């Protein structure tokens, strides 16, 4: 009887830990912690810091592509970029796994989406995403 009870308690604890780990890795959404833009007449670059809210980053390139899509779609939870003023011609992103890492400056990775000709603002990230290439830093 005691052995059966111990097994049930151990299984319950393991399921609870698995649920907590699942939530910490996949249950929270990424969000922007800060953003800034700089530019001239024909070139505008958006710099963004993103907090992933995960424990582990398994595929940095896939993660970078997801962040690029969220920037293009303007679909981050707490930030709306003002694309009505000017749409970026370049995007630079610093990625942090969690808020604590962001506060201490411990980035997971960083990347940029740029055009071949970085000076000319012919293409923007919203209307011409195929003209941009991913550069992992």
Where do the protein language model's features map onto the residues?
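Short amphipathic alpha-helical surface micro-motifs
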Residues: 13-15, 27-33, 72-78
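C-terminal partner/receptor-binding element of secreted or periplasmic proteins
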Residues: 113-137
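Hydrophobic membrane-insertion alpha-helices, especially the h-region
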Residues: 7-25
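Short edge beta-strands and adjacent turn/loop segments
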Residues: 26-52
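Positively charged n-region of N-terminal signal peptides that target proteins for export
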Residues: 1-5
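Mature extracytoplasmic domains of secretory-pathway proteins
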Residues: 49-109
């Amino acid at each position: 009887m005691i052995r059966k009870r111990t097994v049930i308690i151990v299984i319950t604890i393991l399921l609870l830990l698995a649920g907590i780990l699942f939530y910490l890795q996949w249950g929270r959404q990424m969000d922007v912690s800060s953003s800034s833009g700089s530019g001239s007449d024909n070139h505008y670059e958006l710099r963004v810091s993103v907090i992933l809210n995960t424990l582990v980053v398994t595929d940095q390139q896939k993660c970078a592509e997801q962040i690029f899509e969220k920037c293009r779609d303007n679909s981050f939870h707490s930030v709306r970029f003002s694309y009505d003023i000017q749409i970026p011609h370049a995007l630079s992103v610093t990625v942090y796994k969690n808020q604590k890492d962001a506060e201490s400056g411990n980035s997971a990775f960083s990347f940029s989406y740029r055009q071949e000709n970085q000076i000319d603002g012919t293409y923007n990230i919203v209307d011409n995403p195929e003209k941009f290439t991913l550069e992992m830093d």
